């Protein structure tokens, strides 16, 4: 029946999404009591690693054949950061797989289950011998495409930043408070 296939599709899609729980520990927050971007970034990378490992594409497995993952781009957009001691979770899924790159997305979810931010990333698998990109579709007979998920991620894809001039237009000494208000 159609209803049964819809339930199967939802379950199948849900199995493609990894959910990982965290707590904003006191040593992971800034003086405002909010999680720092560096710690959030570390959690995002760990979630990508856990998710890939659980599906047979983790660093340890790739290293056996002298391959590794390299992060090419990362864009993060947040409405708010978790506070000290707050529980939060991160979901991750693969949006697309191309021959040389894969798109991995993330949702940051607060303790009430509300999505408070998203991230998009672009990854390449490279040969540790040649340092050149490897063909993702040749890995495990292309089975990585079985994990592609159509979960929405409502932020723009990260694009390459083009530098218009080689000459700096200004100099700025950045201080912590300057960066908070960007």
Label every PLM stretch briefly.
Residues 22, 76, 92, 106, ...:
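Preference for bulky hydrophobic residues occupying beta-strand positions
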């Amino acid at each position: 029946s159609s209803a049964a296939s819809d339930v199967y599709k939802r379950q199948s899609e849900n199995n493609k999404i990894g959910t990982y729980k965290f707590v904003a520990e006191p040593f992971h927050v800034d003086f405002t009591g909010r999680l720092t971007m560096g710690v959030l970034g570390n959690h995002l990378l760990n979630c990508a690693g856990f998710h890939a490992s659980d599906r047979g594409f983790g660093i340890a497995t790739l290293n056996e054949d002298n391959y590794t993952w390299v992060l090419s781009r990362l864009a993060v957009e947040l409405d708010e950061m978790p506070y000290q001691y707050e529980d939060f979770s991160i979901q991750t899924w693969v949006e697309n797989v191309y021959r040389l790159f894969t798109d991995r997305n993330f949702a940051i979810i607060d303790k009430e289950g509300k999505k408070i931010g998203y991230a998009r990333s672009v990854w390449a698998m490279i040969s540790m011998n040649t340092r050149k990109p490897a063909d993702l579709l040749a890995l495990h007979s292309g089975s990585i495409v079985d994990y592609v998920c159509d979960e929405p991620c409502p932020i723009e894809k990260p694009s390459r930043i083009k530098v218009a001039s080689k000459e700096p237009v200004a100099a700025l000494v950045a201080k912590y408070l300057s960066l908070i208000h960007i």
